[in-house]
């Protein structure tokens, strides 16, 4: 479960992804919206940091998904089934969805850590396609959260930081 954020602009995020991940982001975004809208129990996913990150900011996630669909369509990737499901969810839930962007987008350090850890992970997934992100691997901002866990996170999740601060 993931929403890749290698840029601060949703359109730039979509433009920067390879076709495989771009198409998957539409589906995963839908799944996250479904969980947040109470239309899916979500099981353990409801506590996943990618889900929690968008809680209360579903309209921001909607904008992210719209950008993914727009670029997928420009690239000739079929999105009809996903769009049909998204439209149905939108029509049922739009009024209950929260504001556009999560507060952490106003924190320059958090944003840099998110963008950099996402770029580093994309580079590690496909070094050829994401060669332009290679410098993210050694960037000081490539500092995932929870480094002391048995299996440290690969990404920086602001919701983990907030949760850990409360403990």
Q: Locations of the language-model features?
A:
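Sequence termini and other peripheral, non-core segments
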Residues: 1-45, 51-167
């Amino acid at each position: 479960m993931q929403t890749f954020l290698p840029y601060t602009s949703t359109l730039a995020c979509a433009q920067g992804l390879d076709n495989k991940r771009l198409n998957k982001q539409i589906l995963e975004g839908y799944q996250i919206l479904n969980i947040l809208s109470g239309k899916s129990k979500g099981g353990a996913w409801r506590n996943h940091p990618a889900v929690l990150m968008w809680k209360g900011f579903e309209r921001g996630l909607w904008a992210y998904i719209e950008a993914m669909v727009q670029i997928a369509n420009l690239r000739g990737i079929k999105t009809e089934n996903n769009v049909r499901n998204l439209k149905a969810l939108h029509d049922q839930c739009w009024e209950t969805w929260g504001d556009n962007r999560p507060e952490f987008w106003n924190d320059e350090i958090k944003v840099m850590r998110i963008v950099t850890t996402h770029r580093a992970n994309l580079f590690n997934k496909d070094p050829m396609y994401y060669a332009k992100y290679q410098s993210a691997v050694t960037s000081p901002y490539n500092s995932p959260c929870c480094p002391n866990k048995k299996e440290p996170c690969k990404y920086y999740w602001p919701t983990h930081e907030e949760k850990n601060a409360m403990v």
